[in-house]
């Protein structure tokens, strides 16, 4: 069964809009629906924030974890909150699919953070394979994609978003490293699973994560 999404019922997002409007004070709230996409725009003064909800077509690969806002974020936003979130391995696994596919500087910057923290752990790679299996692009186009010119997205959609500036050349190095290392980290079982998936006969027993196996 497909998990419910805002595409089918946007009422939770409207509720979020009301809650945000109370926090935004005199800010303007705009809910935009374009086909299957629903976006919430919050604007106050010269600042605009876009809340874009990802469609959910699956459950989680790993059990969710309850986490508190880190100390620095709590200091900046003068608040303290805890929420159920994806496990780090699943969060990074899904991020790797985006970084390999669309190659947006934001995704590649997150991969840099991954490399600085723990690198490509077996659990992260396993989650990557799970998300790759559910992606809307062919497996080979993600694993062996051509390099996209990052310059326009870097200048127009990335510069100014990070606390410390980072050069485009650094992100290009991270992308090159990821495209070289990630395919090489796939286990024999993961490779056989993906080959079977492409052939229309996936062997789910080759996957170690319990949820995809139990759901198929």
Where are these regions (language model features)?
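Compositionally biased terminal segments of proteins
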Residues: 2-216
């Amino acid at each position: 069964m497909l998990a419910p999404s805002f595409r089918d019922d946007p009422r939770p997002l409207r509720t979020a809009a009301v809650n945000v409007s109370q926090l935004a004070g005199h800010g303007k709230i705009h809910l935009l629906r374009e086909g299957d996409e629903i976006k919430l725009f919050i604007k106050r003064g010269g600042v605009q924030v876009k809340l874009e909800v990802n469609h959910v077509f699956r459950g989680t690969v790993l059990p969710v974890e309850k986490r508190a806002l880190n100390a620095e974020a709590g200091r900046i936003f003068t608040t303290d909150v805890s929420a159920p979130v994806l496990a780090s391995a699943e969060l990074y696994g899904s991020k790797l699919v985006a970084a390999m596919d669309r190659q947006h500087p934001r995704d590649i910057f997150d991969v840099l953070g991954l490399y600085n923290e723990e690198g490509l752990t077996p659990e992260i790679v396993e989650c990557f394979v799970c998300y790759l299996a559910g992606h809307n692009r062919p497996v080979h186009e993600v694993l062996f994609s051509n390099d996209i010119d990052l310059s326009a997205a870097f200048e127009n959609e990335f510069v100014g978003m990070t606390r410390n500036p980072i050069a485009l050349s650094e992100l290009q190095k991270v992308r090159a490293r990821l495209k070289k290392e990630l395919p090489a980290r796939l286990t024999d079982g993961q490779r056989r699973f993906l080959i079977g998936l492409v052939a229309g006969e996936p062997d789910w027993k080759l996957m170690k994560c319990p949820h995809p196996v139990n759901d198929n």
